[in-house]
């Protein structure tokens, strides 16, 4: 069953989303050559503590990090370590926090200096696809309308979508119903209703869709070694327009 949030619950989700977005923006500003991914994870821990929130990821199915931090061909679920960020890298960060019992979940991809033109195109187009996907999060539409849009747009631009990991409902739990894949048929899946909150989570590869899991049993990488982009927003479905909850300044799409 897909939870429908009441007004006071939605307000708590707004606060959680704003907090997650603020922490992600702060972490993004710290990305620079020579910084280790472990230092970024530690900074995330400190920022969460200062904000009076806790990580939604730490300990989840025994995940060892406060955030997911992944570089280049690493798609998602990377773990902070002694690895140093280099000029030309693309650093992906996924932040999930619990505030007053409610979760905010958001992700972004940060280019370090100048990246390869095709990689820059991947990042730009993935952000544009996310914007388009969010605009479809309206009552009466179905999850498959979002899924099909993402897949169609990615393929149109010569990219591929990751099939092993998907977007999801979010609220009191990190992963609620419905699943929101980045592939599917238009008109399929659950119908969206006002009061639902979903994480639209794009993972789009420059090359092929095939994924491998590293020896740490967490980090997912592209099998062909080409870069991947990761962007995510928590979105509230309303009777008027989709509301992005994971923005430092609240965004309401027209």
What are these regions, as identified by a protein language model?
Residues 1-254:
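Active-site neighborhoods and metal-handling regions in enzymes and metal-associated proteins
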